[in-house]
Amino acid sequence: MDMSSIASRLGLSGSRPVVRKAAELRRLCDVTFDSSVLGIGEVCKAIICLEIAASKFQVIFDRAEAVRMSGMSEKAYIRSFNALQNGLGVKTTLDVRELGIQFGCVRLIPFVQKGLSLYKERFLAALPPSRRASTDFGRPVFTAAAFYLCAKRHKLKVDKLKLIDLCGTSSSEFTTVSTSMADLCFDVFGIAKEKKDAKSIKGSRELLDVLPSKRKHDDDSDSSGESSGDDQDELDLPTYKRHKKMEKEAYNDWKSSVLSNKQTKPDPAKPRKQAQLNFKKKPSDMALEVSSAAN
């Protein structure tokens, strides 16, 4: 398949420098090594070259569509992308300043730079000396994750999917790096969780409406500040146990009402037999019966 047709299907037909750079990378790949040894087909190789070129020119690349066109899984595509990138000796870089300008968050630049340096120091301090030299912090995923965490800390909206596409990684790897940064540098990237009142949450309000004992407890505490021991014991139970106890009490109430209705209800009247009717016969009728019997 031609490079220009693949680029048009990926929405890159208008970016001619990207297409020319991808064609150059494809020729370099054909000269340098045989990509079939790595298990990369021609179509997949062209798509990966387009993604590398798009990352160099800071052009948004639709990785989901690229994975679908390549006929590979996301993990296999990322593995092939890294192998081809290392074989070509090309490294994608992501500048914090360009991210700040692109997303309109210029004031985050010093915070991101400080967080990256602090994360690098603490991460290397936790590693053994033999592994420190092989650690690569120049990958774009670290810059993108630090930028996303700083934006989240300062309550600024940043498109996470767009960041993942720019750094050329998977969502799982981005989440892993973000979690590692938030754990090691909580003072820079962490977000303090505020404890919210249960009554202010919609789901909790519905739960309070379902539990009459909880409403009674709240009303008594607001009025007198005291509550009964039974209500307190019931509130100490877990939610599912309270629900089970309420169902059992409702069943017992229903059972007692059925039994009380059965006791108070009068016995049904027994069916009565119809008495035989014995009418007095007239003398004329008796004479007719005797005559008929004689005949």
Swiss-Prot record:
Chain residue ranges for the region called Disordered: 212-295
Similarity field: Belongs to the ORC6 family.
Biased composition (Polar residues): 254-263
Any one GO molecular function term: DNA binding
Gene name of the encoded protein: ORC6
Chain segments annotated as transmembrane: none
Organism ancestry: Eukaryota, Viridiplantae, Streptophyta, Embryophyta, Tracheophyta
Function description: Component of the origin recognition complex (ORC) that binds origins of replication. DNA-binding is ATP-dependent. The specific DNA sequences that define origins of replication have not been identified yet. ORC is required to assemble the pre-replication complex necessary to initiate DNA replication.
Pfam families: ORC6, ORC6_2nd
Biased composition (Acidic residues): 220-236
Entry-linked InterPro entries: ORC6_cyclin-like_2nd, ORC6_cyclin_first, ORC6_met/pln
Organism: Oryza sativa subsp. japonica (Rice)
Protein name: Origin of replication complex subunit 6
GO CC annotation: nuclear origin of replication recognition complex
GO biological process annotation, one example: pollen development
Subunit field text: Component of the origin recognition complex (ORC) composed of at least ORC1, ORC2, ORC3, ORC4, ORC5 and ORC6. ORC is regulated in a cell-cycle and development dependent manner. It is sequentially assembled at the exit from anaphase of mitosis and disassembled as cells enter S phase.
Alphabetical UniProt keywords: DNA replication, DNA-binding, Nucleus
Major site of localization recorded for this protein: nucleus
Subcellular location: Nucleus
